[in-house]
Design a protein with these regions (language model features):
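Short, conserved beta-strand element in jelly-roll/cupin
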Residues: 57-72, 76
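Short acidic (Asp/Glu) patches
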Residues: 46-57, 79-82, 99
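Conserved small/polar residues in nucleotide/adenosyl-binding loops
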Residues: 120-122
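Short beta-strand His + acidic residue motifs that chelate non-heme Fe in jelly-roll/DSBH
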Residues: 72-73, 103-108, 116
């Protein structure tokens, strides 16, 4: 079984040229919208050009691309294969990034918009 998991969306209604998606994450207790206006890297490289990563000790992320494309770089030493590169677009579902996972992302040339419906463990 893979270390990489997705929370898929559900189509609940379709009309001419319109699709309604349920993108709920029942576990979520926080949300943020992250907009990259170009091929941004988040977090940016440090002052000498070395890669920087986010890591959350008390938060699981559910990152869903709603516009554009974004590539995530994930490192988790508890996984069988600790290093992954995952490319997301609007059809991918929400990439689940468990707490304790180092992660960073880069948007495609035209940028991207991601909604993160996270679970903060308090």
């Amino acid at each position: 079984m893979s270390d990489i998991h997705f929370k898929k969306h559900r189509v609940f209604r379709e009309t001419e040229d319109v699709i309604f998606y349920d993108i709920s994450v029942e576990e979520s207790n926080a949300s943020d919208l992250v907009v990259h206006t170009g091929a941004a890297i988040s977090p940016p490289d440090d002052c000498v050009g070395a890669k920087s990563f986010y890591i959350h000790g008390f938060q699981d992320d559910y990152n869903r691309v709603v516009s554009g494309e974004r590539t995530f770089e994930l490192v988790n030493t508890t996984w069988r294969y600790p290093y992954h590169i995952v490319r997301l677009d609007v059809h991918s579902g929400a990439l689940i990034i468990p707490r304790g996972t180092f992660h960073r992302s880069q948007s495609g040339e035209n940028g991207s918009i991601v909604i993160n419906l996270s679970l903060i463990h308090i």
